[in-house]
Amino acid sequence: MAKQLKYPFLIFIISLAQCQVSNQNVNLCQSNICQNGGTCLVASSVPATATCPKNSIYYMGSCYVFDTTLRNWNDAALYCNNMNSATLPLVESAEDQAFFAGYLQAMIPSNPPADMRPPPDGIWTAVRGVNNVTRASWVYYPGSFLVTDTFWAPQEPNIYVNYNDVCVALQSDSFYREWTTALCTILKYTVCKVAPTQIQAKYVAQCSCPNGYGGQTCETQSTTNQQASTQRTCGSNDFQFSCPNDQTITVDFASFGAQESSMCNQASQSREQTCSNVNSLQTVINACQGLQSCEIRNLTSTFSNTPCPVPQEQYLETRMRCETAQQPSCLSGLIQFDSRCYSMTIETNEKKQRTMEDAQTYCSQSGGSIITSPPDALLQQIVQKVNAETKKTVNFWIGTPNNCQLLMVTGSSTSYSQCPSSPSSTANVICSTVPQSTASVSARPTQSAPVDPVSQTMARREVYTGVQPPSVPDSINKPRYCKKEKKDGITYEQTRACMLHEQPCPDPQNVEGTVTRYCNCQTAKWETPDTTNCTHRWVAEMETAIKDNQPVEDISSTVNRQLKSTIERTLFGGDITGTVRLSNDMLSLARNQFSVLNDRNLRENKARNFTENLGGSGDQLLSPVAATVWDQLSSTIRIQHASKLMSVLEQSVLLLGDYMTDQKLNLQYINWAMEVERSEPEVQTFGAAASPNVQDDMGMMRVMAAAPPAPQPETNTTIMFPSLKLSPTITLPSASLLSSLASPTPVAGGGPSILSSFQDDTPVGMASTPNLNRNPVKLGYYAFAGFGQLLNNNNDHTLINSQVIGASIQNATQSVTLPVDHPVTFTFQHLTTKGVSNPRCVYWDLMESKWSTLGCTLIATSSNSSQCSCTHLTSFAILMDISGQVGRLSGGLASALDVVSTIGCAISIVCLALSVCVFTFFRNLQNVRNSIHRNLCLCLLIAELVFVIGMDRTGNRTGCGVVAILLHYFFLSSFCWMLLEGYQLYMMLIQVFEPNRTRIFLYYLFCYGTPAVVVAISAGIKWEDYGTDSYCWIDTSTPTIWAFVAPIIVIIAANIIFLLIALKVVLSVQSRDRTKWGRIIGWLKGSATLLCLLGITWIFGFLTAVKGGTGTAFAWIFTILNCTQGIFIFVLHVVLNEKVRASIVRWLRTGICCLPETSSAAYNSRSFLSSRQRILNMIKVNGHSYPSTASTDDKEKQLTPITKTTDWLSRLPNQDSVSIPESNFNNLNGTLENSNLNSAEIKEEDEIPELRRRVTVDLNPMIVSNNEIERMSHASSDPRGSQIIEVTAVEKKAPVKRIKFPLGAKQSERGSQHRTKAKVIAPPESPVSESGSKDYRF
């Protein structure tokens, strides 16, 4: 605490005089696992001092922060509201009174400011008054909850004219225990109730045992050789414990707390603590587990955040035992020393080191604590590890905040110094943890975290609805409402939070009653409708038939038929409760009617028909359709009626055995199965008609153990039900043993008697007195699918992870105790293998209506199954703890997905950034299509950055909502640009000429404006759906998700249409311009691939939100695809794009002189000279090189294929004319057609370069004079000295009209306008020969 108490003994006296505190521990378990009268307490896997922030104290699931600034009520409420949505405190129980009495006297300054008149006294609570006609109402804020339990001091509340100005405070005259009224404008101190530190602590169970018992669950009696010890140590003392040589400490129980109004006396009789620290067990385990001796100094300082206000009352109660020492094992990379594992951080950069408070939290997250007083041998290992990392001086925190030191490691030497006074000082940390073992906290049964009872009931509080509204600012108490909603044909009007909405049940002609639905106080969202009062009219009609004593087999048939029809239409909660009630009444009626029948065959037929119909009704109530309606019932009603239904079905099995004439009969349903066997007592063998390991004609699998040759064979029988998925198996003792233990009941009679013979401590042995009764022995088997879920308490972090199986003899409501050496054994198949742990064998206790482990033992277990043995007969199952998200992502899988997401998104972000840079900074790539690429990459880049940085920032509700909105906007914008990818492809195919003005402005307006409108509308209507407690994204359980899904569906559908049109055109047109169509096909492939990637990615993303086992596979697919979007875009549009590659190479060559030419097939042999010739030209002309790549991608450069060199020209024959054969021109014509004037090397249709040289080549032999050749060789030398012939090279401003043909033009139509010779356009200066033909310069 921040300071010592001023009046500890005065508090003690007042406590004795003024109140009686109930001995109810605030940390009691919700499900008791303790045996022999032990008390179950909740313990945390996080050690002490890690739950609350600094300068605060932990109490009942919350942290309380005291502030000395004086404020009026409104300012105090606003101050707390701004502190992570904290609230003012509330006193609603005797435990609260005891806490605040001690806490406030310790915290409120003893010397108030001298200038304050009157001096400040006490703190504000969350309660204030409201004028309500002639009386005052007292309301709790925020939420406007009506206060029902008050704790007024004597003479309170005072009378005021205007109660709107009156608030409730805790003041010193009542020792801060009772309520007093004061004007809200008076200044008082402030205490804020805030949520504890969000450390993923696991809460487990520990047992406080009565005297004489020990073990983790009080399962053993204390003996001297076990060295069992229960020890009490006052908080002002040091704790010590030691074991003999060769033995180590095992901690079974530890709780640091107090008994209010009882000062600690170490020799006094131990009683239950009225308050305790949930971190006690882990703290003591860290200090003592596995050691021969241990010591904890200054207990009050170690457990400084204990909610018990008076240190003089606090004490540590422990129960330890000494066991043979076991060699512990630590994870790889950790230092192992003296039964402890040590992990350490080594950072020389102070910014990466931790403060003392952060270091505590860091160690606590792994269940450990900061090292204290390391011995020399351990220091040597620490020094070695430090020297292996760095040669600099490294500082480590040692001890606790109240007893802190700095360990300095420099080279091979160590030294200690006092901790710096500044709370912002940083150092490295060494964490000490206990090796994992069966005694570790993680191996204990899990429990729900201890919760403030006020918070537990907050969702069901009554809201003030008086005639006059409270005068509270909206910033403190803004009313919230559940929106109008239509569900299952019922319209629920807008309802204020914390209010109950009531509606008549639908279909009033066939259904009677009302349906209610509650608007949750804390979330302002509708809860599940309660249809318990909605019942079809046939239920009442059948109740009347039972009262009229109509034939029970007819009633059961009608119920079965009506129930089936109801499930096919609409089933309500009242139908379930009514049918269970009918089933129980029909069972009693059947006993009465069948017992008076004398005709044996008639009695058997009636009993069989009744049992089949009753079983059919039970099967329908266990169906998946009915399971959703079961969930609408409250937990108490659901468990009560499910337990009754299971009991009725079990009793019906033996009822059939009473009247059957066959020795064996079974009934198989979809959701349950049963078999009943009947045998006469003189028959010593049991089930002899069955063959070993075979399935009989009635569907039962029977495995008979081999019986030795003896007059009375002792054979065990194994039963399973193949008709049920994952059916358990049950192995029973011999028939003769079961017959001797059976306690038969009369065939006729009234209701069953419920006995618990297996609770008798005296087992029935093999030498029991023989049973002389000659009545038939009835043995029933049954297995159920679905009862585990219905009988499970959803609030205790456990689940029934198997089908339910059981057996009974003579009476299903009476259990028979079996000898310890002849138990019944089971093998259960686990329904869920992910996110569960700690299997326990349990049976259903009808008297207590809960699962119990009494008499059952776990034999063996694996991830898929468990084996159990029990010493009694009833219904059994496997109970397991929920250690993760069941059936979804948990543990290592979630961590693996996080790693994959982080690495994949990092690579994707880099690829997207590179793509944006390429499409932005290369001017020759800037066109409409690449603008679409660039913006697509930019939107995905921002979206993935926001995803990585903010997806899990759920601490700040507003910030989380902003992250969700940004993700929604940029992902929608990405898909809009993806739509334009397909649209641009479509426009390229249907337009002959591209319009001169670009539509890029409209593109920007569409892709950035449309998503903004969609997001603005959805966020404005349903802002609360953006961001959840688990992730910063749209709540997938709300209709708002369709604001994202619907546009994506439309965009994907439109793009598919565009791509199909483009594919149809490409496949239907036989174009001579193959290169152009090759370019279109390439773009088509890229667009289709990208569309599939983006579309499939979010399809799997949506499926990931679907609950079930397949969600895991979808999560992996979505994670991988989402993280590789940027990589695919970079590969498709940059790496595999020839034009982009050429631009990048050309850019690189401008800065790197000797960079090799590209080896692309589109350029070699056409655009480059050989390396040898280039070197010769450099020497021959200027002695330096010029770039030889003339690409059509560059609008400023010509494209001149090189066909001749100077060396070739010099070897021509010395004659006046050269005759060129016709074949050469044929080759030349082919060269022209396949020259680099193809579409693949032209960026857009409007990027046609002008003809630099225009020549016409006739297919007749061409005569070229030597003089012209020589003149041409001098005139056409390129800068490197090579002679080139420029054939059909085009120029941007060429005075040539290119002929274009519409899509679908046939080859003949194109060919009719082609000539077998190319047009020759002579340069203006070309002379005309005498024959009328022009001279040509190549």
Curated annotation (Swiss-Prot):
It is found in: Cell membrane. GO terms for biological process: cell surface receptor signaling pathway; self proteolysis. GO terms for molecular function: carbohydrate binding; endopeptidase activity; G protein-coupled receptor activity. SMART domains: CLECT, GPS, HormR. Residues 59-193 form the C-type lectin domain. One of its GO terms (cellular component) is plasma membrane. The chain crosses the membrane at residues 902-922, 931-951, 960-980, 1000-1020, 1041-1061, 1086-1106, 1116-1136. Disruption phenotype: Reduced response to the inhibitory action of emodepside in pharyngeal pumping. Residues 923-930, 981-999, 1062-1085, 1137-1338 are cytoplasmic. It is a multi-pass membrane protein. Residues 841-886 are annotated as: GPS. Pharyngeal primordium. It comes from the Eukaryota. The record marks 873-874 as: Cleavage. Residues 20-901, 952-959, 1021-1040, 1107-1115 are extracellular. SUPFAM superfamilies: C-type lectin-like (SSF56436), Family A G protein-coupled receptor-like (SSF81321). Residues 1300-1338 are annotated as: Disordered. Autoproteolytically processed at the GPS region of the GAIN-B domain; this cleavage modulates receptor activity. Residues 25-64, 180-219 form the EGF-like domain. Keywords: Cell membrane, Disulfide bond, EGF-like domain, G-protein coupled receptor, Lectin, Membrane, Receptor, Repeat, Signal, Transducer, Transmembrane, Transmembrane helix. Residues 233-322 form the SUEL-type lectin domain. Disulfide bonds join 29-40, 52-63, 80-192, 167-184, 209-218, 841-868, 856-870. This is Latrophilin-like protein LAT-2. It comes from Caenorhabditis elegans.
